[in-house]
């Protein structure tokens, strides 16, 4: 089944996701990581507008810059711990819609 294959690819990240997400959100978070980066923290997606999406969560250049300014942190999007903490903040403060472009892949 496709859902199981998605989760198997990102099982290495399950402890990190469990540490930062509510139980009800763990599967969704793992599926987003699968859909966005196939669980690869160094994944880079190039966009037609010249920006890049980077890391497990595929944070866009503009979104990452905005979050760094807003939350006053430093660090790299390819850092799986940092990017997961930032994703957690974004999801629990602003919702899942930031990953709507891949929703066809991760929605239940």
Each language-model region and where it sits:
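Secretory-pathway/luminal and periplasmic proteins that interact with or process carbohydrate-rich
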Residues: 37-44, 94-99
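Stable alpha-helical elements in mature extracytoplasmic
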Residues: 13, 17, 25-29, 60-63, ...
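Second-shell loop/turn segments in exported
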Residues: 3-6, 16-20, 42, 46-47, ...
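Export/targeting segments at the very N-terminus of extracytoplasmic proteins
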Residues: 1-39
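Amphipathic alpha-helical interaction surfaces
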Residues: 35-38, 62-65, 93
């Amino acid at each position: 089944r496709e859902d199981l294959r998605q989760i198997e690819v990102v099982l290495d990240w399950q402890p990190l996701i469990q540490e930062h997400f509510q139980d009800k959100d763990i599967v969704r978070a793992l599926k987003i990581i699968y859909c966005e980066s196939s669980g690869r923290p160094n994944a880079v997606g190039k966009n037609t507008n010249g920006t890049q999406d980077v890391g497990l969560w595929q944070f866009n250049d503009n979104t990452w810059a905005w979050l760094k300014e807003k939350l006053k942190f430093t660090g790299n999007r390819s850092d799986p711990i940092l990017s997961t903490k930032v994703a957690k903040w974004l999801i629990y403060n602003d919702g899942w819609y930031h990953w709507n472009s891949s929703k066809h892949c991760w929605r239940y």
